Amino acid sequence: MRRWWGALLLGALLCAHGTASNLECACGRSHFTCAVSALGECTCIPAQWQCDGDNDCGDHSDEDGCTLPTCSPLDFHCDNGKCIRRSWVCDGDNDCEDDSDEQDCPPRECEEDEFPCQNGYCIRSLWHCDGDNDCGDNSDEQCDMRKCSDKEFRCSDGSCIAEHWYCDGDTDCKDGSDEESCPSAVPSPPCNLEEFQCAYGRCILDIYHCDGDDDCGDWSDESDCSSHQPCRSGEFMCDSGLCVNAGWRCDGDADCDDQSDERNCTTSMCTAEQFRCRSGRCVRLSWRCDGEDDCADNSDEENCENTGSPQCASDQFLCWNGRCIGQRKLCNGVNDCGDNSDESPQQNCRPRTGEENCNVNNGGCAQKCQMIRGAVQCTCHTGYRLTEDGRTCQDVNECAEEGYCSQGCTNSEGAFQCWCEAGYELRPDRRSCKALGPEPVLLFANRIDIRQVLPHRSEYTLLLNNLENAIALDFHHRRELVFWSDVTLDRILRANLNGSNVEEVVSTGLESPGGLAVDWVHDKLYWTDSGTSRIEVANLDGAHRKVLLWQSLEKPRAIALHPMEGTIYWTDWGNTPRIEASSMDGSGRRIIADTHLFWPNGLTIDYAGRRMYWVDAKHHVIERANLDGSHRKAVISQGLPHPFAITVFEDSLYWTDWHTKSINSANKFTGKNQEIIRNKLHFPMDIHTLHPQRQPAGKNRCGDNNGGCTHLCLPSGQNYTCACPTGFRKINSHACAQSLDKFLLFARRMDIRRISFDTEDLSDDVIPLADVRSAVALDWDSRDDHVYWTDVSTDTISRAKWDGTGQKVVVDTSLESPAGLAIDWVTNKLYWTDAGTDRIEVANTDGSMRTVLIWENLDRPRDIVVEPMGGYMYWTDWGASPKIERAGMDASNRQVIISSNLTWPNGLAIDYGSQRLYWADAGMKTIEFAGLDGSKRKVLIGSQLPHPFGLTLYGQRIYWTDWQTKSIQSADRLTGLDRETLQENLENLMDIHVFHRQRPPVTTPCAVENGGCSHLCLRSPSPSGFSCTCPTGINLLLDGKTCSPGMNSFLIFARRIDVRMVSLDIPYFADVVVPINMTMKNTIAIGVDPLEGKVYWSDSTLHRISRASLDGSQHEDIITTGLQTTDGLAVDAIGRKVYWTDTGTNRIEVGNLDGSMRKVLVWQNLDSPRAIVLYHEMGFMYWTDWGENAKLERSGMDGSDRTVLINNNLGWPNGLTVDKTSSQLLWADAHTERIEVADLNGANRHTLVSPVQHPYGLTLLDSYIYWTDWQTRSIHRADKSTGSNVILVRSNLPGLMDIQAVDRAQPLGFNKCGSRNGGCSHLCLPRPSGFSCACPTGIQLKGDGKTCDPSPETYLLFSSRGSIRRISLDTDDHTDVHVPVPGLNNVISLDYDSVDGKVYYTDVFLDVIRRADLNGSNMETVIGHGLKTTDGLAVDWVARNLYWTDTGRNTIEASRLDGSCRKVLINNSLDEPRAIAVFPRKGYLFWTDWGHIAKIERANLDGSERKVLINADLGWPNGLTLDYDTRRIYWVDAHLDRIESADLNGKLRQVLVSHVSHPFALTQQDRWIYWTDWQTKSIQRVDKYSGRNKETVLANVEGLMDIIVVSPQRQTGTNACGVNNGGCSHLCFARASDFVCACPDEPDSHPCSLVPGLMPPAPRATSLNEKSPVLPNTLPTTLHSSTTRTRTSPEGAEGRCSERDAQLGLCAHSNEAVPAAPGEGLHVSYAVGGLLSVLLILLVTAALMLYRHRKSKFTDPGMGNLTYSNPSYRTSTQEVKIEAAPKPAMYNQLCYKKEGGPDHSYTKEKIKIVEGIHLLAGHDAEWGDLKQLRSSRGGLLRDHVCMKTDTVSIQASSGSLDDTETEQLLQEEQSECSSVHTATTPERRGSLPDTGWKHERKLSSESQV
């Protein structure tokens, strides 16, 4: 107020005589004279304003030199002299206006939920590190970089992304660092023959190629197409098939994805509001000469001087010369423009006189007065502005300035106040609002996934992946749901916001759902579909779907909701682009904007700001307007190549851009502060801000009871409306009908729709059906509410209820082009025409009892209708001679009724009342009718019918579909007049019918006991009114009512996914699917047992042989193991055997018909055997071999007398058959493209049929040969003698494989084995000279030549991930047999218990230890918890204990064999223990350790007396086995690629075999060492003494793991625990010199005693229910300690163990496996036996020491085993200690450095990890390559190449080597080291990158790798 009245004071300005340069000014008495400005301007202010603390002069001269006023005690004295309330000090506001009240303030005590800014402000703690500068000094955003989790990758900028996004081909880091230094990309796998490969590698079905839909997501499936689906009127078709607005043609913008809309353009068609660039592009006219290069060629900025004056800002004045100056300089007496236009009379400048001065009436100024160059200049205080009179001031309305406040603004005189909506809070700047709640997240669709990004951090997370083509999305924050549309799948889906629980919401009736919006208040889902031109609504689960808006919609795109106001907003970029709105019930529709729009894409609502924002991809602009469309303004009009979607949050806009593949942001008011949030995205689509304030709470108008509505409750303004799903009539204001009574039914290729006649809106509704590809024909049956349709893409006939439920395929085989369909509602029959097979067929309405009615003289039959009253059916024929025919519904009385003036007769319809037949002719462009006999023909409609297709009648109307007008029309059925269009703009219209419930009833004899027919009863025009018919391929018997039981003579063939038959009993060829209810994936070979009527087939994908009856029943698998690629199969119906070839295993096998007694017949010198045939009477089998040297061979049916018949001029001999009548062999060769014939000895060879394109299966019956052909996809027939008369039996059969011809009437031959199986106990097999007895694989035949042993005696047992197999060593074939143990996933280790006959195994996928009998039965889990990676397993067959290593937990454990009494034996100083072995007789436990320092250790069976045996020159000690006879250990080293051995003390070490590829496990039997090898995928063996005679036992086996020998010689011997468990209550552990009792780690229900014999033996039902081993007839030696003992490390205390020794695991610690002490109360016999045993052991020990001492004197100094012996030797009572000699580094390739240096261990962990991955995940790596890879950390693999000289010296000093040995070893050492450069192989020089492997990653099978 002071400034207001002070401005009214009078003042006088007295200037000195002279110019302003005198710098002297004088004001009146009542005024203060301000300092003269640099321009000589003088200013006078009222005197009372001097020294008042305000800078009134503007230069502080009125406040200079002032004596500060005295403030009251309650006030604060500012530095500028101003007095303010003391309570305002340090409150965060600048009240002094010089900030002195906020200086030197103590830190404000912020609340607990606040963050203290460095400037003293307090903000919410949630705002700290959220990316917003809330403090104003950015102190709240000075944050430490977030740590990435183990499953994340850190980008170079510090942000975190999902680990699997690293090097995935997509740039996920903002700086692109995730795609740097990546290995070469792996090319996408090729698609199969029935798929199309998109540009970016994705495979889609080939039928989607060039179908007009963007199925790939990048339109690559629609490029280079010869034809496309037509575009709508007003649209231009791009070369790719995309349809765009026709007005965009030649407008300078490339709107087509291939830029074809801008090709061959002469002139651009720019509008009057556009400027045409030199390039032809059209831009806004207002952009002309605006200083921005909008044309991209700068042509819009050229010649601008003649285009008119530039535009000045609103606060500027435009001078005549074009210059812009500030408005305040207007009429100030100064020539600021330069042309004096700012001071001209035209500007109404008041004349200035010398008398005017600020001292007189304040110069006439209302507030401030200044003298500038001798003239008065009025100014105003802050918050005011000068009016046009230049004197008075008026209040500035800051609230009118856009963006001054973020949300709300209240203006007052000279001031204003900002405020925020509920849910927001003012920031410290007092102008901007911040949303309360969590940090905002941008949720966006990226086409193939949906991701989240933090807008201020650019951190990136994946929500959903593996999507097809996600476009639109929205979320429901309260329900934590995300919704999205997929325009490739044409689906709307939803999931939880954590990415779980993905489910379909809307799956039918969608074509291009480009917009999606969630009503979070009323729980509704709205979407737009530019393909159907609709806006629809449904519940959140998709229920009660309703078409809301459909009229005057062209291409609705984006949609946004305002549930609080009950309004929908949407964009439409059709021919008339616009933005519209309506109530959420569809009422009150209105236009928001319809000018200056081209391609309005994204749309969003700022709920707090009450505005809408949208992007226009054509105009390259972001605009905004009020919600009613007013105050429209462009926010951003530059730098927007192709904006797609937009969202808003707080004061920022975020949008996606297709061209830049980025997410961008800018200020929503000004468009400034543009920033790229994310770039290099895959294809950014829709975007939303995920935050609760984007979905503010609102009133639910429908309440808790859905508004009382039965179906939909939709908000309408502030009220609501009850609505019904589309097509359902409304009964009253709240209720809808529950069903439909009548509706128009029509097909549209990809869907089937209905238009309800129960309502007036006539909008069509999609019946929710799945997998509709190309629907053509329709019909219906109102009795069960079924709708039937044919699909010419899937070649099926299906049905469902009219609401889409109960969908079922009723006919799915032997269809090629089912074009017509008719339902006989009287007899419940289904009739159809097939234009591909030229047939008319019939079946029951469920598809059963199908038969062919008419197959002759048909040429592309099309539509069909039936008239059950008269017993006739009618059909149109589209062929060379178009016609309309009729016949009885049983195919009798066939006649042509219309044959002239027809071109393309399409739809048919019968008017049952007037007995008329109607048809539509697309060629004649007419609809006609005639009598049912063809008489009285008349044209009903003969004009304006471009292409009628479907036709139907209802009531007085006729309805038809038209392909060209894309519409459904109707007219009067009698006159053809009163035409109207029901629906238009419907692509791909097909058949049409009216569903109603008034079909006339008809009586028929078929209604009574099926007319007496055994199968089909059909209506007939005959006097009886019906006739009986049989299913396809079956003959009707003479009684005319009964059908024969089945086919007698037929072809049966495999078609990969099914088995089919073609009857040869009838005069036509029709294939019938054998209805086998089993999964088939790749059925190849086939055979038939005519005796039992069963078919046998092999499946090379499922790896099994199965069988079933010919009617599909009694199906079962007979062989399920040991099969790889079974290409050939033959059934010996006489001998009751099945034979097969296996290309994968290169074997020929035989078994009984039930798969039992399986035997390998031929296994040597086979190379891809394929077809096989039998000649039982001759005892021969014949087969083709497809290998490198193709051939035809023969042998006896027992595998004997093998002979090569033909081995020249063969390529790919596929099919094979024997003609017994002519004694000839016939075969088909796909490479030579011939079918050839020879006699049974291979002579007289000649060509029978040539050329044939790609024959596969071949068979023979009577006078004909039949074969399948891959190229023609057909079955062919020819004369077997001449090869002539080749005909097509069946065509259009993709996936054809084997074929057999069967005549069940032919008698079987004589069985050579007779009725008693030839006296054989197992197999009796024919041979040319009779027969032979044989045994199943691996079992020996006894000397009598008839009887087989019950099982093999000695055999190998090995694991191969998903299987356990056996190889008998009793027989010579060495073929593997699967042990049928169920539920195997990833078997690693195994062992066998010969007492119970059980195999024990570990499964690291399930983390269990299990056991089972060898026949696969009695499988049970022994250990089912607490395991991580059990790599080693061993059975103590004497004490009945089980031992295992756990690499994941670094433990060795034991339990009873049933898993009880579990106990950890060793759990320290272990680093990845692997293999384990036990020696019960010695009481020893051995294991390998794969860790940082590899070693092999030994302990007692209780874990005590632990000792390192080998710790030098080891890489990856994998397998371990014991030779109990020679008392030696053998192990394989997968890194050093060798097999070694040593004695039980680790001495006398010897390399047995070098240069093995990658051995994993090994075992020993007799003189052989057997091992498995990962790289060679084989089992091999070598002589254990010499290392020679290396042989491959089994080859080509994936995933080989453990291997053991089962033999009576392996598990022998005993110990004290072998009798009654040693008297122990729980665990009994034998040791080297005694035994101990132990208790489990977790007590059980039985008391545990450490004293043997104290507890009575447990009953057999307890955990000790284990059998004792069968012991030899010798007394066991048992030795017990009489006192409790504690084991410690050698030489006394543990403290004397060095740190280095501890690292090497050389110290036995006192806390390791402290054994329990035996008790005192032992039986006397035990004591006596113990004393005798002590004496015996002492004698043996002494003898052994003497022997070794003498032996060392005579040992050959050159023996290699001494080279690797331990460096020190001690007595048996002492622990061996090995000094830690430094290992040499491979890097500098030095053998030995005297000075030593730090110890170097193997840098092999990374390669080990890779092997670990192979162990758990099923990888099979090329290990030669793996070893060459470099470490990601720069380390090189170091190999222990040379022995250390110190090691030799230590051996010598310890006495283990004499002088000769020492000298010899030193010489060898120097020799080895000098040759290290040549001896070192390249694969020793690298290591692998760290894979980050964890044990938990396990896969169930190799197929998952």
Curated annotation (Swiss-Prot):
UniProt domain LDL-receptor class A: residue ranges: 26-67, 70-106, 109-144, 147-183, 190-226, 230-266, 269-305, 311-350
Feature: compositional bias, Low complexity: 1671-1690
Glycan-carrying positions: 264, 498, 719, 901, 1077, 1415, 1467
Region (Disordered): 1659-1696, 1853-1905
Placement of LDL-receptor class B repeats on the sequence: 480-522, 523-565, 566-609, 610-652, 653-693, 785-827, 828-870, 871-914, 915-956, 957-998, 1093-1135, 1136-1178, 1179-1222, 1223-1263, 1264-1306, 1397-1439, 1440-1482, 1483-1526, 1527-1568, 1569-1610
Localization per record: Cell membrane
One GO cellular component term: synapse
Origin: domain of life: Eukaryota
Basic and acidic residues composition bias: residue spans: 1882-1905
Ranges of compositional bias, category Polar residues: 1872-1881
GO molecular function: apolipoprotein binding; calcium ion binding; coreceptor activity; protein homodimerization activity; receptor tyrosine kinase binding; scaffold protein binding
Cytoplasmic side of membrane: 1747-1905
Gene3D superfamilies attached to this UniProt entry: Laminin, Low-density Lipoprotein Receptor, TolB, C-terminal domain
Disulfide cross-links: 27-44, 34-57, 51-66, 71-83, 78-96, 90-105, 110-122, 117-135, 129-143, 148-160, 155-173, 167-182, 191-203, 198-216, 210-225, 231-243, 238-256, 250-265, 270-282, 277-295, 289-304, 312-324, 319-337, 331-349, 358-369, 365-378, 380-393, 399-409, 405-418, 420-433, 702-713, 709-722, 724-736
Domain EGF-like: 354-394, 395-434, 698-737
Topology, Extracellular side: 21-1723
Keyword set includes Signal: yes
Family: Belongs to the LDLR family.
PANTHER family in alphabetical order: LOW-DENSITY LIPOPROTEIN RECEPTOR-RELATED, LOW-DENSITY LIPOPROTEIN RECEPTOR-RELATED PROTEIN 2-RELATED
Role description: Mediates SOST-dependent inhibition of bone formation. Functions as a specific facilitator of SOST-mediated inhibition of Wnt signaling. Plays a key role in the formation and the maintenance of the neuromuscular junction (NMJ), the synapse between motor neuron and skeletal muscle. Directly binds AGRIN and recruits it to the MUSK signaling complex. Mediates the AGRIN-induced phosphorylation of MUSK, the kinase of the complex.
Protein name: Low-density lipoprotein receptor-related protein 4
Source organism per UniProt: Rattus norvegicus (Rat)
